[in-house]
């Protein structure tokens, strides 16, 4: 784990979206919800959601088609094979979302968003690609509420797009070039208080990950079953290895396979986003809301700084493979995932680590 800053000297003195593409979260009747995709030019796609129901609907925009960040919005395939995603994975506290995280649609109203799918996927091969979106749209209990109490399952139409590979390559290369430049940010982002907070966050991450590794390998089988829906010895050992890799990464602030930034060096932060991981280079950036979280939570399953670091590093392919997705957030939603989904969902790991370390 590299921390980009003058923090390296400090560490030596001191000693680390919503993509809800699943069908097992609490669902509501999806009658009246319509999502249509259309091609607007080479790799640009427009999504339109329409509420054809009789009541207003408030849904979460984060990690969906209507998130302005480079999160996974659609599924892309070519010749039957999925095209890998290369964007960002963000962490949000699903139980503490700001009002601007939601959009409200009155009956008959529509909302649209346009994005470039080449920003988060390498489509330079060109030719015919299939593009679609499906999953669950998290919804609020009532209009104007910020409490998520369910989700509406949706499935868009499927597009077949003939893509100019050279033009797609330019879009993707531009994004990758930006990431490359950012990886050489100087030591200004982690000075002072922010730097000390990150040092302490990494220490907390080590504690969580080490406890979770022990719990996964040799701990209570029922506790493991609660979070990962299996007690397979092979699966338990593999989960333990992931936690061991995270513990090692968080214990090495001056070396390692990832970099933590104390500021939003990529410009993806928005209110409600706590931190994010850039898939392409396993960089973790913290947002202002990260510093509003408690440094340490000793009871329950709420997020703190170490919790978030564990969550983000499960996304980092340089730390452990396969990397995780953001299928669901928070205990109530994560508990409804099946075994395969749970093992691939970042927050299940943070929740398990918190449960073991805090005795929750």
Swiss-Prot record:
<keyword id="KW-0732">Signal</keyword>
<keyword id="KW-0482">Metalloprotease</keyword>
<dbReference type="InterPro" id="IPR024079">
    <property type="entry name" value="MetalloPept_cat_dom_sf"/>
</dbReference>
<keyword id="KW-0645">Protease</keyword>
<dbReference type="GO" id="GO:0005576">
    <property type="term" value="C:extracellular region"/>
</dbReference>
<dbReference type="InterPro" id="IPR050414">
    <property type="entry name" value="Fungal_M35_metalloproteases"/>
</dbReference>
<dbReference type="Pfam" id="PF02102">
    <property type="entry name" value="Peptidase_M35"/>
</dbReference>
<keyword id="KW-0479">Metal-binding</keyword>
<keyword id="KW-1015">Disulfide bond</keyword>
<feature type="propeptide">
    <location>
        <begin position="20"/>
        <end position="182"/>
    </location>
</feature>
<feature type="disulfide bond">
    <location>
        <begin position="190"/>
        <end position="262"/>
    </location>
</feature>
<keyword id="KW-0165">Cleavage on pair of basic residues</keyword>
<dbReference type="GO" id="GO:0046872">
    <property type="term" value="F:metal ion binding"/>
</dbReference>
<comment type="similarity">
    <text>Belongs to the peptidase M35 family.</text>
</comment>
<dbReference type="InterPro" id="IPR001384">
    <property type="entry name" value="Peptidase_M35"/>
</dbReference>
<feature type="binding site">
    <location>
        <position position="311"/>
    </location>
    <ligand>
        <name>Zn(2+)</name>
    </ligand>
</feature>
<keyword id="KW-0862">Zinc</keyword>
<feature type="binding site">
    <location>
        <position position="315"/>
    </location>
    <ligand>
        <name>Zn(2+)</name>
    </ligand>
</feature>
<feature type="disulfide bond">
    <location>
        <begin position="269"/>
        <end position="287"/>
    </location>
</feature>
<keyword id="KW-0378">Hydrolase</keyword>
<dbReference type="GO" id="GO:0006508">
    <property type="term" value="P:proteolysis"/>
</dbReference>
<feature type="binding site">
    <location>
        <position position="326"/>
    </location>
    <ligand>
        <name>Zn(2+)</name>
    </ligand>
</feature>
<dbReference type="GO" id="GO:0004222">
    <property type="term" value="F:metalloendopeptidase activity"/>
</dbReference>
<comment type="function">
    <text>Secreted metalloproteinase that allows assimilation of proteinaceous substrates. Shows high activities on basic nuclear substrates such as histone and protamine.</text>
</comment>
<keyword id="KW-0964">Secreted</keyword>
<feature type="active site">
    <location>
        <position position="312"/>
    </location>
</feature>
<feature type="signal peptide">
    <location>
        <begin position="1"/>
        <end position="19"/>
    </location>
</feature>
<keyword id="KW-0865">Zymogen</keyword>
<protein>
    <recommendedName>
        <fullName>Neutral protease 2 homolog UREG_01255</fullName>
        <ecNumber>3.4.24.39</ecNumber>
    </recommendedName>
</protein>
């Amino acid at each position: 784990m590299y921390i980009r800053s003058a923090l390296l000297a400090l560490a030596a003195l001191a000693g680390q979206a919503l993509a809800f593409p699943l069908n097992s979260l609490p669902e509501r009747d999806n009658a009246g919800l319509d999502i249509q995709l259309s091609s607007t030019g080479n790799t640009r796609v427009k999504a339109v959601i329409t509420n054809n129901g009789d009541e207003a609907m408030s849904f979460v925009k984060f990690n969906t088609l209507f998130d302005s960040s480079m999160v996974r919005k659609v599924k892309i395939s070519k010749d039957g094979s999925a095209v890998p995603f290369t964007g960002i994975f963000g962490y949000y506290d699903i139980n503490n979302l700001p009002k601007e995280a939601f959009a409200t649609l009155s009956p008959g109203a529509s909302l649209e968003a346009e994005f470039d799918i080449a920003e988060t996927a390498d489509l330079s091969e060109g030719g015919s690609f299939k593009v679609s979106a499906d999953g669950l749209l998290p919804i609020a209990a009532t209009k104007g509420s910020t409490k998520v109490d369910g989700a509406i399952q949706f499935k868009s139409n499927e597009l077949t797009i003939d893509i100019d590979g050279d033009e797609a390559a330019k879009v993707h290369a531009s994004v990758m070039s930006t990431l490359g430049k950012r990886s050489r940010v100087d030591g200004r982002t982690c000075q002072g208080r922010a730097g000390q907070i990150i040092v302490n966050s990494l220490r907390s991450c080590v504690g969580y990950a080490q406890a979770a590794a022990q719990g996964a390998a040799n701990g209570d089988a029922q506790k493991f079953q609660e979070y990962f829906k299996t007690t397979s010895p092979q699966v338990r050992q593999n989960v333990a290895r992931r936690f061991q890799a995270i513990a090692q990464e968080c214990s090495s602030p001056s070396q390692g396979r990832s970099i933590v930034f104390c500021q939003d060096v990529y410009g993806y932060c928005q209110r409600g986003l706590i931190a994010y991981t850039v898939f392409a280079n396993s960089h973790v950036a913290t947002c202002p809301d990260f510093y509003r979280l408690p440094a340490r939570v000793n009871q329950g399953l709420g997020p703190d700084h170490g919790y978030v670091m564990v969550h983000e590093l499960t996304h980092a392919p340089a730390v452990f493979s396969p990397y995780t997705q953001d299928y669901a957030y928070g205990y109530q939603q994560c508990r409804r995932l099946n075994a395969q989904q749970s093992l691939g969902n970042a927050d299940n790991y943070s929740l398990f680590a918190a449960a073991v370390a805090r005795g929750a």
